[in-house]
Amino acid sequence: MSEIKFYLVKGSALFGESHYPEKRKFVKIVRALNEKQAIEYIYSYFGSKNKIKRYNIKIEQISEIKEEEIPDRRIRELAKIDKIIM
């Protein structure tokens, strides 16, 4: 069974393509099994939240990071959770 890893994804996207196009850079931490799934998550995230087409998202760098290297404390704490009881 594969282990879930953390990926740091850097890139740029074209926001507001139809009205006033603006190219913005982004940095996002993603949990995925491999790089391919991390890239797919980025495309689906920006597509659903901001209505950005895949061809307007340019991924410049993707790198695997360790759990200790994650800058956001909330993400580190969520990564330690084994199960959720509802």
Curated annotation (Swiss-Prot):
One of its GO terms (cellular component) is ribosome. One of its GO terms (molecular function) is large ribosomal subunit rRNA binding. Keywords: Ribonucleoprotein, Ribosomal protein, RNA-binding, rRNA-binding. The keyword rRNA-binding applies. GO terms for biological process: translation. It comes from the Archaea. Pfam families: Ribosomal_L18A (PF01775). InterPro entries: Ribosomal_eL20, Ribosomal_eL20_dom. Belongs to the eukaryotic ribosomal protein eL20 family. Part of the 50S ribosomal subunit. Binds 23S rRNA. This is Large ribosomal subunit protein eL20. It comes from Saccharolobus islandicus (strain L.S.2.15 / Lassen #1). The lineage of its organism: Archaea, Thermoproteota, Thermoprotei, Sulfolobales, Sulfolobaceae. The gene is rpl18a.
